[in-house]
Amino acid sequence: MYSGRLFYFCSMKHLLLFDDPAIRGSLLPFTFTRPIADLRVGILKISEKWEKYAGAEVSYWTQDYLQNLFPRSEQQGIAINGSWLPDSNSWQQVIALKENEALFFGKTLLATACSAQEKSFAFVSEKKIIQATQEPILLQKTWHIFQFNAAEIRKDFILLTAGRKSQPIQDPHTRCYGEHQIFIEEGVQIRAAILNAEGGPIYLGKNSEVQEGALIRGPFALCEGSTV
């Protein structure tokens, strides 16, 4: 037996991440060339975080001049504020929404069902307003990218490594502390480095390189193909 609420969400497989006009301007110049949800905070971009929780693809509702580069899907789906940094509680609130409801925090729209034909958010006025059960983490200022980075690395580390096994460190001259919080993807090269994850996780992305003499303290992330 299923509830109408669950059936509704399961039929809404697509997530549409929208640029909040009240926030986008405060994130310039980064948002000159990309939607808010394409910004990276922690290990993952905001869009990638939502994809991990949803197990579904996302698209973007952004500025007209960016829309061709970041296409909007023609599917009906859930519109989600692109500045919202999700966690498990956020996701539970999203999947609990009914078609006639809109999730707000104060006056800030967080999520609502949305058709592909909508060109503005005027339709939200017809929805039943539901207030979020806890204050959301919103990327509202440029410095939040750095202020939230450590906490987001910790959250993303769990999303990316749950149920997976790290690649081993082959180099005998590399020293590790807090090894249970170090995760190494395939193709990583490490030579004569010190990795200290006692204060937070260390994530080394695919084909990244840690060169000789590097001293790394967590929380820390080296993304795919990068060098330190």
Where are these regions (language model features)?
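Structural signal for interior beta-strand "rungs" in well-ordered beta-sheet cores
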Residues: 168-228
